[in-house]
Swiss-Prot record:
Protein name, UniProt field: RNA demethylase ALKBH9B
Compositional bias annotation for Polar residues: 440-450
Biased segments, Acidic residues type: 145-160
Catalysed reactions, as listed in the record: an N(6)-methyladenosine in mRNA + 2-oxoglutarate + O2 = an adenosine in mRNA + formaldehyde + succinate + CO2
EC number(s) given by UniProt: 1.14.11.53
Localisation: Cytoplasm, P-body; Cytoplasmic granule
One Pfam family, short name: 2OG-FeII_Oxy_2
Binding positions (Fe cation): 335, 337, 396
UniProt superkingdom: Eukaryota
Predominant subcellular localization, coarse grouping: cytoplasm
A GO biological process held by the record: demethylation
Molecular function via GO: demethylase activity; metal ion binding; mRNA binding; mRNA N6-methyladenosine dioxygenase activity
Provenance organism: Arabidopsis thaliana (Mouse-ear cress)
Length: 507
């Protein structure tokens, strides 16, 4: 045993602990073995402890010769091992008490399932490579649609695995778990995305009762925690570049925080957007002669995922975005997005959950404090799609956030409003949604006319693509029985479109 390449990786004290531990587990390990195999296994476990080994001339099934193997004598756990061996052999021959040897059910042994010696626990922690499988697990399977991310993560994982492994893993015959292909993993995540599209808030607009939230969609489960971390890290890197003056002048904006709610930093890509008339007299909208940086590569990866995963239609692929970096107390006042941008558009939330208020008549109660008819919590990693009345009739705002937050809003510019220097991104052309698993829905009629979205790309609420019509044409229809039953998630007052009983204090 002392020449075994596997055992050479361990200290004598560790082998002793392993020997004692496995001796206690011997009844389970030797279950259903014949006496000779049981005896061979017992001797092999005992031989793990070199401090108590002695040369022995006994042979076990002809495997051990004089001086070639050792049997541990006078071990502290010898008595317990022999007892369970005798008891096991006697009962197994009689066909009795077989179930008593399942994990955690040994009545005659001292060990209790779930309890490990402290020394042995430390050994396990110090030897993580021993219990790992030989094949590395891809940490970036979540970004399955992007080959470059998969390859990068595979290389990193292989380097970490190779540095941890101190032995030839191929010598261990560990059964491999069945692997899913990248397409299978992506499809599994795709069909598990939750999509809420039945927001209702009835308000009187121009003398008519309308659902001002018609067209809103909330998609959760689109971005994994790993993907979110990578995106947030990228945003902070861009923020540092902006602060160092390494981005174009109008790309990064960091206003002086002169009052509560006025310190939000922004990063714009694809176009420069003016929220209000500026000092030069430019009206709100896209500034066609102001130059900003193009979309970063990772942001284009996000856009492709939004299209492929049926969050945005392929007829409205975003070509610009704005990143909002909130500090505690920052906010966005009530507004309707300028119609220089087409509908639908979307915003993704990172770092922390916050509420977004909707209503045709939002009120400013104080710095960063607003009230409205309907409040929607935006979970971390969620995507809120604005279309129809939800984009053009109801205003929206973000009250002062209680903690740090990042949001990225992706929008497609009207071609007539694009900057004079703008060039469409080649890798954002011809993106198609991934096929959906029709068997999961139980009805193919829900997915009819999958790519019929020509009505969604309109400017203004007078000619908009039409809220839930976007869903009814079959772009994506989740399992309504589970994902649209929101009685436990949304207060009844919100479902009826009534104001909340009390206004939340965002201070």
């Amino acid at each position: 045993m002392e020449n075994d390449p596997f055992l050479r990786q361990y200290q004598p004290s560790e082998l002793k602990i392993a020997s004692e531990f496995l001796t206690n587990w011997l009844p389970f390990l030797s279950k259903d073995l014949c006496k000779d195999c049981n005896h061979l296994l017992s001797n092999r476990i005992r031989s793990l402890d070199p401090a108590h080994c002695s040369n022995n001339t006994d042979k076990v099934d002809g495997e051990c010769k004089t001086g070639s193997c050792s049997v541990v004598e006078n071990m502290g756990s010898e008595r317990a091992s022999n007892n369970v061996d005798d008891n096991y052999d006697e009962k197994s021959e009689n066909g009795e008490d077989c179930d008593n040897h399942s994990l955690g059910s040994w009545k005659g042994s001292e060990i209790v399932f779930g309890s490990f010696p402290e020394d042995f626990s430390s050994v396990l922690q110090s030897r993580p490579a021993v219990v790992e499988t030989a094949s590395p697990r891809m940490r970036w399977a979540d970004m399955a649609q992007e080959d470059e991310f998969d390859e990068e993560e595979e290389e990193e994982e292989e380097e970490r695995d190779s540095s941890r492994k101190g032995f030839d893993a191929s010598s261990m015959k560990t059964p491999e778990k069945p692997k899913l292909s990248r397409d299978q993993r992506e499809n599994l995540r795709l069909i598990n995305v939750k999509r809420k599209k039945d927001f209702i808030c009835l308000e009187r607009v121009k003398g008519k009762i309308v659902n001002v939230l018609d067209g809103l969609e909330l998609h959760t489960g689109v971005f994994s925690a790993v993907e979110q971390k990578r995106i947030v890290d990228q945003v902070y890197q861009l923020q540092e570049k902006g602060r160092r003056g390494e981005l174009k002048k109008r790309t990064f904006t960091a206003p002086h925080k002169w009052m509560r709610g006025k310190g939000r930093e922004t990063i714009q890509f694809g176009c420069c957007y003016n929220y209000a008339p500026d000092r030069a007299g430019n009206p709100p909208g896209i500034l066609q002669r102001e130059e900003v940086d193009p979309l970063p590569h990772l942001f284009k990866v996000i856009i492709r995922k939004l299209i492929k995963w049926h969050v945005l239609p392929p007829t409205c692929v975003p070509d610009s975005c704005i990143v909002n970096i909130y500090d505690e107390g920052d906010c966005i006042p009530p507004h309707i997005d300028n119609h220089d941008f087409l509908r639908p558009f979307c915003t993704i939330s990172f770092l922390s959950e916050c509420d977004i208020l909707f209503g045709s008549n939002l009120k400013v109660e104080g710095p960063g404090d607003f009230s409205g008819s309907y409040s929607i919590p935006l979970p971390v990693g969620s995507v809120l799609v604005l279309n129809g009345n939800g984009a053009d009739v109801a205003k929206h705002c973000v009250p002062a956030v209680p903690t740090k937050r990042i949001s990225i809003t992706f929008r497609k510019m009207d071609e007539s409003k694009r900057p004079v220097w703008f060039t469409p991104e080649p890798d954002l052309q011809g993106i198609e949604p991934l096929p959906l698993d029709l068997n999961r829905s139980g009805s193919t009629s829900r997915f009819s006319r999958l790519n019929n979205h020509n009505g969604t790309n309109q400017r203004g609420h007078g000619r908009r693509g039409g809220g839930n019509g976007y869903d009814s044409r079959g772009y994506y229809n989740p399992e309504r029985s589970s994902e649209h039953n929101d009685s436990g998630d949304w207060p009844s007052s919100q479902r009826r479109g009534m104001p909340r009983p009390s206004r939340r204090n965002y201070g």
